[in-house]
Amino acid sequence: MLVVDSKTMKKIDQYAIDVLKVPSICLVERAALAVIKNINLEKRTSFAIVVGVGNNGADGLAIARNLLAMGKYVEIYIVGDLTKQSQDFKLNLDSCKRLTDKIFEPKSIEDLAIMERNLEEVSTIIDAIFGTGLNRTVGGMQSYMISLINRTMKYTISVDIPSGLDGDSGRNWGEVVDSDLIISMQIMKRGVYEKSHFKDKCIVEDIGIPQKAIRAIL
């Protein structure tokens, strides 16, 4: 099995986007559909999707948009500074705002208490807070959010990597989402591979990164 660290994966992504001119929004869409492909939509009909404001969050919003288009019940929780949102995040957020008003930005412990009650009503949580680029201890609202996700003990799917896990070493950056399923995009991430607790829960899905990009970097 091919395994890469976070820096190598970033170089592959950048080569595909900058050199081969694969639109990043296309990769986001393929990532979203890869996650949905692995959900039993007859059993799982209501979702809380928790997103950061970067590209992992963009994947989460694209998942939300597709599920909303299918008529599923979706709540979206945004964790992070929206002034730092990626362009792909913004595009998907603008679309989601036209499909639902259940978009929340928890800012306080009181907001989290409301969120905790809301999470009890959904069948599935999708974790798209942090991707492989996390290199700092998780604190503040993000730490509370991850702790809350774990405390609900709801079936949880992580996009690419469990939020809070180091993409290279598998170490914990404080709180880590205890995922039931991980959909890893294109290539297994070393941090997941090194953590046996997560490795066996991981499915690798092709999201359309050309093999030429992979060969150019590896």
Swiss-Prot record:
Keywords: Isomerase, Metal-binding, NAD, NADP, Nucleotide-binding, Potassium. Its cofactor is K(+). Binds 1 potassium ion per subunit. GO terms for molecular function: metal ion binding; NAD(P)HX epimerase activity; nucleotide binding. It comes from the Bacteria. InterPro entries: YjeF_N_dom (IPR004443), YjeF_N_dom_sf (IPR036652), YJEFN_prot_NAXE-like (IPR032976). The keyword Acetylation does not apply. The keyword Glycoprotein does not apply. Residues 9-215 form the YjeF N-terminal domain. (6S)-NADPHX binds at residues 55-59, 131-137, 160. Its EC number is 5.1.99.6. It is an enzyme of class 5 (isomerase). K(+) binds at residues 56, 127, 163. It catalyses: (6R)-NADHX = (6S)-NADHX; (6R)-NADPHX = (6S)-NADPHX. PANTHER family: NAD(P)H-HYDRATE EPIMERASE. Catalyzes the epimerization of the S- and R-forms of NAD(P)HX, a damaged form of NAD(P)H that is a result of enzymatic or heat-dependent hydration. This is a prerequisite for the S-specific NAD(P)H-hydrate dehydratase to allow the repair of both epimers of NAD(P)HX. Belongs to the NnrE/AIBP family. This is NAD(P)H-hydrate epimerase. The gene is nnrE.
